[in-house]
Amino acid sequence: MATKVITGKVRASFVHIFEPQSVNGSEPKYSCSFIIPKSDTETIGKIQEAVEQARQDGVTKWGGKIPPNLKLPLRDGDIDRPDDPNYTNAYFVNANSNERPGVVDRRRVPITDPLEVYSGCYVRASITFYPFNTNGNRGVACGLQNIQKWCDGEPLNGRVRAEDEFDALDDVDDEDFLN
């Protein structure tokens, strides 16, 4: 059984929600990483409770006990990504799914333009936590359900939008410019 969490305002990263992505030749999946500020104690608390529930649910999958080296989905950005300022003072979870997540705007209107939800924008996410035992790997996974775009943010790829980078040009005669 999976436990669902709806996050508060989190930052999307490594967004692959409109087309599935294959990692190292694996089966293509839809995925997104969610950066959660450490100040969002409500979301972090919900995730910690869901992870604990998944751990308890997993006891039967794991031979009647919780393994000591369990892989857990909630990670500390200050420890796991110390050189990336986007993860400073934040936790993160990587969520994925075999099925395309639902994606809506603030008013719950479906978003179909892949450029509208990008690494760096802010979203709310519906994610689930469940135990797994695959090929000797045991842990709690994070499933991607749905995403609601909250607002735009600075793209994490470092690229600036053209309309933000340039001033408007006056109507100037190009021939005068060349002389």
Residue ranges of each PLM-predicted region?
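OB-fold ssDNA-binding interfaces and closely related basic DNA-contact patches used
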Residues: 1-92
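Acidic, gly/ser/pro-rich intrinsically disordered tails
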Residues: 1-4, 154-179
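Broad gene-expression machinery/nucleic-acid interaction feature
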Residues: 29-31, 90, 122-124, 139, ...
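Residue-level recognition of well-ordered beta-strand positions that form the cores
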Residues: 33-35, 94-96, 126-128, 148
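A short secondary-structure junction signal
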Residues: 45-47, 104-107, 135-140, 158-159
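Short acidic, low-complexity segments enriched in Ser/Thr/Gly/Pro
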Residues: 76-112, 117
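Exposed beta-sheet edge/beta-hairpin loop segments within beta-rich domains
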Residues: 107-123, 130-140
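OB-fold/S1-family single-stranded nucleic acid-binding modules
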Residues: 134-154
